[in-house]
Amino acid sequence: MRRAVELQTVAFPETPPPSYETVMAAAPPYVPPRYLGPTEGRNSIRYSELSPLYDTTRVYLVDNKSSDIASLNYQNDHSNFLTTVVQNNDYSPIEAGTQTINFDERSRWGGDLKTILHTNMPNVNDFMFTTKFKARVMVARKTNNEGQTILEYEWAEFVLPEGNYSETMTIDLMNNAIIEHYLRVGRQHGVLESDIGVKFDTRNFRLGWDPETQLVTPGVYTNEAFHPDIVLLPGCGVDFTESRLSNILGIRKRQPFQEGFVIMYEHLEGGNIPALLDVKKYENSLQDQNTVRGDNFIALNKAARIEPVETDPKGRSYNLLPDKKNTKYRSWYLAYNYGDPEKGVRSWTLLTTPDVTGGSEQVYWSLPDMMQDPVTFRSSRQVSNYPVVAAELLPVHAKSFYNEQAVYSQLIRQSTALTRVFNRFPENQILVRPPAATITTVSENVPALTDHGTLPLRSSISGVQRVTITDARRRTCPYVYKALGIVSPRVLSSRTF
């Protein structure tokens, strides 16, 4: 038999339980000692001669601190400098070099890196290889004892003055360099003005071409800019192997990593510039020589006289081919658009948007004394081999705007700014100054704020840090105007090895 169990009645209080605030106010909560102050915890940061701190430190990398210039950076620049990062005591730069910031070794530390980079780089400068190009031009015209004409060609290097220019001004300076070489060399050895065999232009010389007469019937080439162009005579060529000016012209290789970039006259097959129709002879041929009277209404049906223009008003030859339909001049733009697309110049060159910056490259950030070396880099103490911890594009951008009156402004400036030096042969339809483009492009330096994410920190860093910014060729960049970095350390995880 089961024994009966007597249940006792439990009395509940009639009042509700005390509030949370009342209970917490009755006695202070117990706090373990390790939370009373910053001690040697896994997230502690210790400065020399100071007690451990929480991970609230920020490290500022400043390129132009006045206290660092005389003792640390007198021989440095804004892309390769030393800076003191210990700010909690009045240390001199020499004393700061003996101080350290120690992170708890039981944790893996990382630093959130944010940088500000400002440059003042012009688009045409020797540092970025945008001041020079080579061209093969005629340097002498001689006659031997038998009366035969001997033409001599040589490769010459042309140098542009450094500066920040628009696309139109860059083309004008390239043409001016060709003319100055002719005046200095070619003219002294019998070379004619019509023998100037390298010209940079912007027109489409095929506009107005009549398929019946095979001539440009308006008698002039359309004075409208379409795309930068290269015009060559036989024996001439342009070499952009060691120059980035081809990027400004918008003419690039389809295989950009292959060595060499030479455009010769022979490459421009199918790009001959058509000859101009002699409009004056054509109109004169249609005029009636007889007087039309009311009794007979006699009028002769004369045949139109279709002939090309052979020389300009100054007597310079247009270098016509024997067929009298085309000139010897060949245009890269015509060969690219109207030539053979499989075997012509279109098969290995590419028409691109002109990059007035010359092709801005990337820059690399190196913090060799602060960040751990990435596994893909070997530790080095040479500037050109510093391990890279961050990368970004050079803060140089091309800015474009539309100017419908570009050619009108160009004509006005010839009188006001005296830019007629760029238009030495206004009577010649080939050698005339190329028209300005309606889409004007300029190079602009825009400050860049970049968040590079979290990078692994060393467990101990020096009070003086080196900051290096190198370009794509691992050279320090003299055009860096301002470089600023902010590093925020934080614990990533516990150290497991």
UniProtKB/Swiss-Prot annotation:
Per its UniProt record, what InterPro entries does this chain match?
Answer: Adeno_Penton_B
Further notes on this entry?
All late proteins expressed from the major late promoter are produced by alternative splicing and alternative polyadenylation of the same gene giving rise to non-overlapping ORFs. A leader sequence is present in the N-terminus of all these mRNAs and is recognized by the viral shutoff protein to provide expression although conventional translation via ribosome scanning from the cap has been shut off in the host cell.
Task: Say if the entry is tagged with keyword Repeat.
Answer: no
What's one Pfam family the UniProt record gives for this protein?
Adeno_Penton_B
Q: Return the protein name.
A: Penton protein
| Chief site of localization | virion
Family membership noted in the UniProt record: Belongs to the adenoviridae penton family.
Encoded by which gene?
L2
